[in-house]
Amino acid sequence: MTTPQIPPEESLIEYPCDFPIKVMGPHTEVYIEEIVALVVTHAPGFDAAQALVRRPSSTGKYIGLTFTVRAHSREQLDNIYRAVTGHPHTKYVL
């Protein structure tokens, strides 16, 4: 599947920019490590120590992860979204 091309003058996002991606899944270290690895694959400069916020659910069963990545193109963002959405344990991606 290809990403439709949007002319730069029609895009609402100016690249490069810092872009937050929110992911929700099970509250396990394995899941978090796997999602971080997927993000790093498409955003090699991503530093989880400084650009990852973790928010556990009230029951502790799930965790919300906010990754702030330095996005250089729509294609890069689409690739990150596809990767984290494709993880079998991911519940939501915003």
What is the predicted role of each segment?
Residues 1-64, 68-94:
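Long, contiguous binding/interaction regions
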